[in-house]
Amino acid sequence: MEHISGGVCAAKGFQAGGIHCGIRKNRGKRDISMIISEVPASAAAVYTSNLVKGAPIYVTQRNLAGGIAQLAVCNSGNANTCNADGEEVAWQMCELAGKAAGIDPHHVIVASTGVIGQPLSIEPIAQHMGALYAAVKGNGSQEAAEGIMTTDTRLKEVAVSFVVDGKVCHLGGIAKGSGMIHPNLATMLVFLTCDAAISPAMLRKALSDNVKDTFNMVSVDGDTSTNDMVSIMANGLAGNALIDSENVDYAVFCAALNEVTTALCRMIAKDGEGASRLLTCVVTGSKTVRDAKLAAKSVICSSLLKAAIFGADANWGRVLCALGYSGAEIDVKKVDVAFRSAVGSIDVCKNGASIDFSEEKAKEILLEDEVDVVVTLHDGNASATAWGCDLTYDYVKINGDYRS
């Protein structure tokens, strides 16, 4: 497996683009994006667990019932959520995109992100859909990634190549996500493309299994968005034998999927609103994977610990506190905690109790822009990893005037 450039355009037969259509006030910001497959593709998606769902979620769920899609369209600046005509507008987006590209509107993945509770006018979208389609190109992944950004400060794009059945395949993705990130079943907005041949059923299984260990293990602020969705299209143009069972080829595909989604998870967590550090919690020695996940997620969700990481304060007691209310079955008298970064590692807790350590060395480690909290439970062989970020003054500033 090899990391390559191209994002969602790395896979054969995929093109993408993004333009400004007028949803957002700033004319310098793209606010609508499109991804197109040359041929109909196997498709799957997972969605937010929030009971309040954006209208595009319902439309996409219906469109993907048959496991086939050929185009994805997404606007930013307006979530199209809690609007009386929301589903009608989302379906109109499908029709407009389908007409422009000559594609069945029922084969369109539609998404929106932005402010909740504001009507989304179809007029600017209708007026610019032709221009959006004209902007789609074979190297347009970056423009598409820009078009789905809201409070993001970094573009999130990744791709890999891998070999299945002797054929070189490609899998790439773009994502948006900076705030309201605390998913369950899906997260933020993620668009994945692949040229491997895989059945809709196996693609759905691969994605559903994958998000449990990747996107479901990310949290920035504890808020679960109304519009979270991860979607994938696989068009088969790599020419490999169809993956229709859990065989060796399926395992290779899943490994490539995990490589891409894990990279996107780290990008999303590192770009948390106002964040200055990527916070990763690695839990090992757990009785079960479930306990390991509960423990890791609890640690990266702790506001007190996130604030301590921002201040480069080695307050390991906040780690134990988070473990204690995590719901995981642990024996605190066996727990070890260490902090780790590019400049080194330091043990700060052994067997659930304090030990002597250099505060200066700990601070040096915690001042790096990527920090790991390593928790060893000494109770079994299961492990899990979760990703988050520190909590800074800027998070409040950004969300205090989000609508203005």
Model-assigned labels for residue ranges:
Residues 1-88, 92, 98-404:
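A structural signal for small-residue-enriched, beta-sheet-centric alpha/beta enzyme cores
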